Amino acid sequence: IYIFNCDLLKKYLIEDEEDPNSENDFGNNIIPNLLRDNRKMYAYHFNGYWKDVGTIPSLWEANMEVLDPEHSGINLFDENWKIYSRNSGMTGHRIGEDAIVEESMVTDGCNIQGTVKHSVLFSGVTVEKGAVVEDAVVMGRTTIKSGAVVKHCILAENVMVEENAVVGQKPADGSVGEVATVASNVTIGKNAKIGPNAMLYEDVKEGEQHD
């Protein structure tokens, strides 16, 4: 988090934009330039959880760390440091009789009839019977239909994963690796296969493959 004098920030941003060799980055350009000019700067030493989520793998990793508060240091259930968020107004989540849910965060409005392991599910997600979700971040109102497999990926809002489609792949070496991503309102057709490097912004037709 940065707090700037507005006029000063504007001056340095304009200068940075005019520099053809700049990376246009706060940490690599703006802050060093302020130091170069001996501008007054103050830092607050923060000991709690913090993570830069400037990349897709780091965003995925941050969500996975929510599931492991003992090691990551972030605990959403800490009464002494509450984290407030918007309430969707949906009903409580529903877990089917034959559903399997392990080490996951399932929020309001979700309907889980399949298998969910080590994943974060936002409000209103549906996982049909026979579907598998593992090591995934699934955002609001997304539907994963019967027989579909979703692993090691991020699905944005209102995504539809049709029957027997496969999205993402867990790295064999256990690393963060590549994280497949699917943008909002995209439909993944039946039997489609989406590789671990894929970044999808448009619908995928039945049976198609994307690496």
Ranges and model annotations:
Residues I1-F4:
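Short glycine- and hydrophobic/aromatic-rich loop-to-beta-strand nucleating segment
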Residues D7-L8, E15-D211:
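Left-handed beta-helix
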